[in-house]
């Protein structure tokens, strides 16, 4: 849950990973899931729960990386980035970073189109099928 207004993000209160797991279980007991859209994931626990679900369910998954607010506030714990790269992105069909998010995910500063292409290629090495 984010505390924010039109000026920016003031604070973030992550939902415990167990709640995310229980919500996924509740939905999958109720209906067939054909695809998954992933948005803001703030910590390793939540990322692991989603990655585990995708690992055992092999669904098409779009990861709309929400890493930084428009006002520059970091929305993901720095220590969660490696879990995102190693455990979640390999299960994603499509990853949709904007430029600042692509810089964070790839570790490549983006100043021109060539940098953008290099960052995209780096993100592909994490195992997603497209970026």
Walk through the language-model features, giving the residues of each.
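Conserved N-terminal subdomain of the carbohydrate kinase-like
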Residues: 1-70
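Glycine/proline-rich, positively charged
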Residues: 66, 72-74, 100-103
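Short glycine-enriched, charge-decorated loop/helix-capping segments at active-site entrances
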Residues: 8-14, 73-78, 107-111
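Structural motif
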Residues: 34-35, 60-61, 74, 93-94, ...
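Conserved phosphate/ATP/ADP-binding segment of small-molecule kinases
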Residues: 78-131
